[in-house]
Each structure stands twice: as C-alpha cells, then as structure tokens.
C-alpha cells in the first residue's frame, strides 16, 4: 500500500459495519493496515483480529507503543488517549475484508482470481511468470488464500502494479463466494474440479459448485477461463455463468495445446515447458489462455520461462550421486497424487521409488482413494514404495500396491535412515502426501546432505 489511506477513507469503507468512531481526524493518513504488532511501524493502523488461540485486542498496548495511530476493534478500548482513532465494529474480520474491498476498488488493473481442486498455486505461479514478461505483477504470497489472506493480498496492491493474481482456497460452501465478493476479479480462472476436501463437502458435484462460486460472484462484465478437459467443471459452470468464457485444454478448447516431449505446441508454436508433467502442461496452458485473454504476445515465450515454486511444490533436487528427489509434499489430493505418480514413472532413471503418506479430508472415501493410489503404483510398475505410516489409510495404499516391494515407517527419522541406506545412483524418488503428514520434514532432512536444485 504505497498510496496512503486517510482515516476518512477507513470510515467510508467501514460504513456498513461501523458502530462508532472516536478521535477521528480526517486529514490524517495511515501507512498500512497491520494485524500483527511484530511488523507494525509508526503511522500504521492496527486491526485486532481474533482467532481460535489468540485475540488481537490483547496486543493493543504493543501496537500503541510501536506507533499505531488508529485501531479497529470489536469492543471499546480504554486508555487510547486523544490522538489515537478507534473504529468500533461488529466483527474485526469483516471490517478487514471491507477495507480490503474498498482499497481494491481503487485499481483498474486486471485482477485475476484463481481457484481449483488441484494446481491452483502452480497455475498462479505460472501466470505470474508469464505476466512478469509484460509488467509488474502482484500475487498471493505463501498460503494467503483464505478469508484473512485474500484481504492481506489486496491491501498490498500499489499503483506500481500492472497485474494482480489472487489465489482463492476453500474448505466449504460460501467461502469462494466471499473471496470473490472482496476481490471482484476481472478474470476468474478455474483449473479443475477434483476430490480435494470431499470429506467436508460430500461429493465432487458439491466441490464443483463451491469452486464455481467464483463465477457466480465475479462481476458480470468479467471473463471466465475454464479447463475444457474437466467435464464436471464445464457442466457445472454453465449453471453459474453466462458471460464471456475462454476454454483451454490438451483435449480441446478455444486455446488447445498438445504436449510433444518437453514442449507445449500451440497454434504451431513450440513453447518449452517450464515444469515437467502433463498436469503442469495443462497449468501452463491456462497461463497462456490468460495471456491471450489480455491481448499479450504470448509467442515471446518461445525462448523459455523460469518458474520458482514454493517449497514442496514441483521442486526437484539432486541428492548424492545421481539421485533425484521430486518434492511434492506441500499438499495432496487423489488427482494430484495420481498425476505425480505418472510424472515419476516418466522421469528418466534406473529405479523409480514412491515415498508416500496419507491424503487428508477424504472422509468415508479415504480407504477407497488410498487403495487407488496403491493400485496406481502397481500399474505403473514402480520399483519400490516407502510409506510414512502415521495414518491408518496408508494401509490401503499398501494393499492396493500388493506385489510392489513396500516398506512402512511409523516416523520420519526411521524413514530417512532407511532411504539413506537404500538409495543408489540413478534412483528417482517422489515424495507426496498432505502437508500435515510431515513428509516435508523427511525431504528437509535429506536435503541436509547438501543437494542442488535441478
């Protein structure tokens, strides 16, 4: 937020949820909206959020000491003095969202909302890499993709930005709708619909409907970009959206690409794939479709594109002597797991070993989906399976992979020790599980052996 807001602006943004305001000096401008006193500097406004294990109101004294000139609270606070403005609201999280929505409305740049069951973060990073060839890009950082993170992302917008990419995650109905109402994207992109969070929503159709809330709540003059290869997404989207639509896909669509080795072929033009795997070719095609939507010269990408993904997402490391680690430990779902196993099977090497853990939030589908993962390991003819067996569902992976040499470990250190004694030159390993399983710590311990990214 390089262009400062006045306290009058804050009052305007909060009009629908404001109970009272004291010590308001309309000509005073704030530097930033801050929810964490550890990063607050003099001239900031402190907004006291509440969480399951914290209450931001407890940190108001620290905020004042650090130089906060205004606070947003959901209860009256004594001892602020006569120079600190207090905005009393019904709910500070709602207030945070209203301020972010008001700030976003000051920008006329393309705002791209990205969601999907699988690949939304990778697609966001590919879009950012593409758009950075044409201007200054602002994007969702880390996992700031929920009801708190999206406002934070929007409040970081500045007049220097030419494009903004807002990732939107959900764990239930109504959440994407809320995020779209706040961000008001000019383009809404849905990568796919799968089974992630099926234990919470109950069915793939319910997941599709939740994802398509993006379409229902983006402005009617905006554009939808949809993965034509995902039949359920396309069927569901028709019920939510009748506006301008661009489809993309490896099987068909307005932007139709094909994979030829390590290249994506589009309209006779060969583009080097920034990331390995057919699933990532589809994600890259989504970014190209977006570039076309914006009228950008995507053919400039023939010289190649570099994408730096967050830790645990499509990262490759060289370990020891000619051993490659494929790190996919940040998060997981059935479709993502199966695609990553395909990637491992198609990675040149001597032995291909899967190091897997459980997939979370599958509910009653858990045993069946995990058995499908094991069956995939067996069908691909992988050379070995290592399981971090800290979840009962990993037994179903082992059962599905019956016939594949399988080793199970109850904790990360014992798994690391076994891998160090097992690995041979030419081995290719895939590490894949839901983030909460802790398989990322196994990769981190192995990386202590001084690896290099590849």
Swiss-Prot record:
Say if the entry is tagged with keyword Nucleotide-binding: yes
Q: Catalysed reaction(s)?
A: D-alanyl-D-alanine + UDP-N-acetyl-alpha-D-muramoyl-L-alanyl-gamma-D-glutamyl-meso-2,6-diaminopimelate + ATP = UDP-N-acetyl-alpha-D-muramoyl-L-alanyl-gamma-D-glutamyl-meso-2,6-diaminopimeloyl-D-alanyl-D-alanine + ADP + phosphate + H(+)
Q: In which pathway does it act?
A: Cell wall biogenesis; peptidoglycan biosynthesis
Q: What Gene Ontology cellular component terms go with this record?
A: cytoplasm
The coiled-coil segments of this chain are none
A molecular function (GO) held by this record is:
ATP binding
Which Enzyme Commission number(s) are listed?
6.3.2.10
| Biological role | Involved in cell wall formation. Catalyzes the final step in the synthesis of UDP-N-acetylmuramoyl-pentapeptide, the precursor of murein.
Q: Please identify the protein, giving its name as recorded.
A: UDP-N-acetylmuramoyl-tripeptide--D-alanyl-D-alanine ligase
Q: Which gene encodes it?
A: murF
